[in-house]
């Protein structure tokens, strides 16, 4: 769970549009589908999930 310099642009993308940050980190997986759903249901849950995915992987 180390933060690298490549995570910084992913975090910026995650703040603007959370699915983009997840897509940059994991590609087109179930994480992206979950994040799109969370972003549609509420913007803040999408951001939280995106930050979790970026930090965890």
Curated annotation (Swiss-Prot):
Keywords in alphabetical order: Membrane, Transmembrane, Transmembrane helix
Top-level taxonomic group: Eukaryota
GO cellular component: membrane
Membrane-related topology note: Multi-pass membrane protein
Ranges annotated as spanning the membrane: 3-23, 36-56
Keyword Membrane: yes
KW Ribosomal protein (keyword) present: no
Cited Pfam families: Pmp3
Classification via InterPro entries: PMP3 (IPR000612)
Localisation per UniProt entry: Membrane
Family of the protein in this entry: Belongs to the UPF0057 (PMP3) family.
Protein name, as recorded: UPF0057 membrane protein T23F2.5
Organism: Caenorhabditis elegans
Lineage, uppermost ranks: Eukaryota, Metazoa, Ecdysozoa, Nematoda, Chromadorea
């Amino acid at each position: 769970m180390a933060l690298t310099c490549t995570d910084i642009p992913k975090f910026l993308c995650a703040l603007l549009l959370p699915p983009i940050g997840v897509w940059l980190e994991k590609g087109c997986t179930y994480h992206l589908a979950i994040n799109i759903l969370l972003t549609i249901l509420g913007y803040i849950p999408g951001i939280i999930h995106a930050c979790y995915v970026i930090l965890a992987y």
